[in-house]
From Swiss-Prot:
Family: Belongs to the glycosyl hydrolase 1 family.
Residues noted as binding a beta-D-glucoside in the record, renumbered to the chain: 54, 157, 202-203, 346, 417, 466, 473-474, 482
Cysteine disulfide links: 222-230
A Pfam family: Glyco_hydro_1
Hydrolase recorded as keyword: yes
GO process annotations (BP): carbohydrate metabolic process
Protein's UniProt keywords contain Glycoprotein: yes
Name of the protein in question: Beta-glucosidase 11
InterPro entries in the record: Glyco_hydro_1 (IPR001360), Glyco_hydro_1_N_CS (IPR033132), Glycoside_hydrolase_SF (IPR017853)
Gene name linked to the record: BGLU11
Residues of the signal peptide: 1-25
EC number: 3.2.1.21
Length: 529
């Protein structure tokens, strides 16, 4: 077994190097080849994404109970760059019809949004279903369908009810598994006749690493010496516990849906994972090993259990008894528990070996022994976006998709988030704020890279831009803007299409499919040797 494991690892490391030659970006300064809806296979889905806390507002309206993000932003405003919150956000709670009309006008096929758990069940099922919350989502779903837009529904996008956090510390307790399953079943019963794509969890990596290791996002738990300087938490154990319970809740819910609802409702169910790409800092084996470990600790943390029934070997070896174990029954339940995988891709980084130091504190953030950086020899991996963590690297989406294809059996994939931010410059005239040519270039290059991966066999069925609107961007508040539509937070949340929204409208125009093969070939050549 040791020899077999070494051979698998060696093959995976070789793949990291091969992918670097497969996905080569367009040279800067050259004109980008044309691309449109016609470049993609028939039936390929295009849409935009959002989440309840970032978009809805209506925090105390319609019977909604507080979520952990309400508590976090109000009790720890210093952890939000501009000390803001999502009490109003984009006010999609009131303006959803306008937003759906915008999607229709752009020609979007689908809209991925999340349901606020605390708007449906302010506590647990025993506390009763909030019918006003059910009505809001019924209205949204019906409005989407009336305009020909498919709903892709995320059940959990980081905003669990504060009542469950108070009752048993939320995802740190196995009690959350049944409460989550009851919440999901409520949604299947109420909306499943019209919703054909369900997502159980969005980015468990972000929720667990930022919420329980760094402490910079809700519920704001970490060891006292970590960056979040939290009052309570254990950065070496709690991230693994919380995500273990999310995986089990996911698997239980998928089993429930498949056994009880899928045949009748004819929908599909999956999960969304982060998909940053990591490039070895140097040609050394230690850098390649570090890049693989970084992938294991981000993507493999979830893909390995979903495909193989257990955590990656690197995690089991490095984390030891701080990493929960699956029972035989749990392993069998988690393995294969999906119809599709959603991947959110934004950026890539370099990875280098970071040797352990004696007597260091245990933390998820250092367990991979990988030093992550955005530059090599002072040269960034790609242009800097507005956020400090964000470098633009289109090749990464291609490399990640081919890595998933080769390592995880080429599952059905949707790119469920992809986009870039700009600084929210409050002094900039509106006319100038709508000129987001960098975003257009970002989408153009990433869609070309996506086509390249599909040309090489990646099983991708759809693409969702982040995001429809500027919105509350978690720890960064309203200091950055990700939207293809501008939101004027100071003037009634008025929406204005940016140039990127107009670009998407042109990109999505439905016409005859002549030239499809030519466009595919041009796009492929732009990202290959």
């Amino acid at each position: 077994m040791a020899v077999a494991g070494a051979m698998v690892m060696s093959g995976a490391l070789l793949l990291l190097h091969l992918l670097a030659f497969t996905c080569v970006a367009c040279n800067g300064g050259s004109e980008l080849p044309p691309i449109s809806r016609r470049s993609f296979p028939k039936g390929f889905i295009f849409g935009t994404s959002s989440s309840s806390y970032q978009f809805e507002g209506g925090a105390v309206l319609g019977g909604r109970g507080p979520s952990i993000w309400d508590t976090f932003t109000h009790q720890s405003p210093d952890k939000i760059t501009d000390r803001s919150n999502g009490d109003v956000a984009c006010d999609s709670y009131h303006l959803y019809k306008e937003d759906v009309r915008s999607m229709k006008e752009m020609g979007m096929d689908a809209y991925r949004f999340s349901i606020s758990w605390s708007r449906i069940l302010p506590s647990a099922l025993s506390g009763g279903v909030n019918r006003e919350g059910i009505s809001y989502y019924n209205n949204l779903i019906n409005e989407l369908l009336s305009k020909g837009v498919q709903p892709f529904v995320t059940l959990f996008h980081w905003d669990s009810p504060q009542a469950l956090e108070d009752k048993y510390k939320g995802f740190l307790s196995p009690n959350i598994i049944n409460d989550y399953k009851e919440y999901a079943e409520t949604c299947f019963k109420e909306f499943g006749d019209r919703v054909k794509h369900w997502i159980t969890f969005n980015e468990p990596w972000t929720f667990c690493s930022m919420g329980y290791a760094s402490g910079i996002m809700a519920p704001g738990r970490c060891s006292s010496w970590e960056v979040g300087k939290c009052r309570v938490g254990d950065s070496g154990r709690e991230p693994y516990t919380a995500c273990h319970h999310q995986l089990l809740a996911h698997a239980e819910t998928v089993r429930l849906y498949k056994e009880k609802y899928q045949a009748l409702q004819k929908g599909k169910i999956g999960i969304i994972l982060n998909a940053d790409w990591f490039v070895p800092l140097s040609q050394s084996k230690s850098s390649s090993d570090a890049a693989r470990r970084a992938l294991d600790f981000m993507l493999g943390w979830f893909m390995d259990p979903l495909i193989r029934g257990d955590y990656p070997l690197s995690m089991r070896e490095l984390v030891g008894n701080r990493l929960p174990e699956f029972s035989k029954e749990q392993s069998g339940m988690v393995k294969g528990a999906f119809d599709f995988i959603g991947l959110n891709y934004y950026t890539s980084s370099y990875a280098d070996n970071d040797p352990p130091s004696h007597g260091h504190n245990n933390s998820y953030n250092t367990d991979a022994h990988a030093k992550i950086t955005g530059s090599r020899n002072g040269i960034p991996i790609g242009p800097q976006a507005a956020s400090f963590w964000f470098h633009i690297y289109p090749e990464g989406i291609c490399e990640m998709l081919l890595y998933v294809k080769e390592n995880y059996g080429n599952p059905t994939i949707y790119i469920t988030e992809n986009g870039v931010d700009e600084v929210n410059n409050k002094t900039m005239p509106l006319e100038e704020a709508l000129k987001d040519d960098t975003r257009i270039e970002y989408y153009h290059k990433h869609l070309l890279a996506l086509l390249s991966a599909m040309r090489d066999g990646a099983n991708v069925k759809g693409y969702f831009a982040w995001s429809l609107l500027d919105n509350f961007e978690w720890a960064e508040g309203y200091t950055v803007r990700f939207g293809i539509n501008f939101v004027d937070y100071d003037d009634g949340m008025k929406r204005y299409p940016k140039n990127s929204a107009r670009w998407f409208k042109k990109f999505l125009q439905k016409s005859n499919r002549d030239g499809n093969k030519r466009l595919k070939r041009v796009a492929y050549n732009a990202f290959s040797n």
